[in-house]
A protein has these predicted regions:
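Bacterial carbohydrate/catabolite-sensing allosteric modules
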Residues: 1-122
């Protein structure tokens, strides 16, 4: 089964949502969070319940913020290269300004799964 919740991209949101999740679904084995800050908050909440991220419950974030590699356990995350996204956005805006035709444009940004210690067989 799967559970999908929306949340703000904050540590506190991760803490709050993890407590909700554990109380409603105590047998959960993994979390995929919409941002690293949410994932970091979820890890803090797990540790406050004497559960170990990566051992008891796998946690994966999204963004690869600097704190992701500095916490214990280090956070598994998807890195999306915001510099590359910004460059693509700037180029797209300039093309739209300078061209009269506006065909649909598709760009691919290759995300990278960075495997650290917060995810494992749980």
């Amino acid at each position: 089964w799967k559970v999908i919740w929306t949340s703000e991209d904050t540590k506190q949101s991760g803490v709050d949502r993890l407590h909700d999740l554990i109380s409603e679904h105590p047998d959960v084995t993994a979390l995929i969070c919409n941002g690293d800050m949410v994932a970091l908050g979820a890890c803090l909440a797990l540790q406050s319940k004497n559960l170990q991220p990566g051992k008891d419950i796998s946690v994966i974030g999204f963004d690869n913020v600097m704190d992701a590699q500095l916490v214990t356990p280090s956070l598994t995350t998807m890195a999306v290269n915001p510099y590359n996204l910004g460059q693509i956005l700037a180029e797209t805006i300039l093309k739209r300004i300078n061209e009269t035709e506006h065909p649909q444009i598709t760009y691919f940004n290759n995300p990278e799964l960075i495997i650290r210690n917060s995810a494992g067989p749980a």
